């Protein structure tokens, strides 16, 4: 994010880090847009999105979630990490941690949630889904409803 309250032009031109996330791809383009048609005015949740493209041809979506939705999805992501085994035994949090080339260290992802991981809740067995739901103290049907709504808004 840009620091519009900075005192000098140099400080104002410097971007501040607001989030970090390892994607595993080299992003080479960002554009405003969405993969879905515009919503009707009466829809409950509107999510501003950016599309990105990578050198390998991946198209992805960055969605700016309202605070309550972000907090819910972050809690769900944390619970899912405890109940889902990563590919090759790699933990999701380790895969998404961001390595700083200048600082020479890795930091956990911050201010991002992994939409693919969140959506994978819909593919869990009923037993695992109930365990995740109990972990965040939200009814399984409510989680399904909210994840499906996010899918509809961002795909």
Regions found by a protein language model. Give the residues of each.
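C-terminal scaffolding/assembly regions of large eukaryotic complex subunits
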Residues: 1-155
């Amino acid at each position: 994010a840009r620091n519009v309250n900075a005192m000098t032009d140099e400080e104002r031109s410097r971007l501040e880090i607001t989030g970090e996330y390892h994607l595993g791809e080299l992003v080479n383009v960002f554009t405003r847009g969405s993969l879905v048609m515009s919503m009707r005015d009466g829809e409950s949740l509107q999510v501003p999105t950016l599309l990105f493209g990578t050198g390998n041809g991946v198209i992805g979506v960055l969605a700016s979630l309202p605070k309550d939705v972000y907090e819910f999805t972050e809690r769900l992501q944390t619970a899912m990490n405890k109940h889902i085994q990563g590919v090759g035994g790699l933990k999701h949090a380790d895969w998404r941690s961001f390595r700083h080339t200048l600082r020479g260290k890795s930091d956990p992802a911050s201010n991002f949630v992994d939409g693919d991981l969140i959506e994978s809740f819909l593919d869990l067995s009923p037993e695992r889904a109930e365990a995740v739901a109990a972990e965040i103290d939200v009814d399984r049907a409510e989680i399904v409803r909210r994840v499906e709504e996010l899918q509809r808004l961002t795909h």
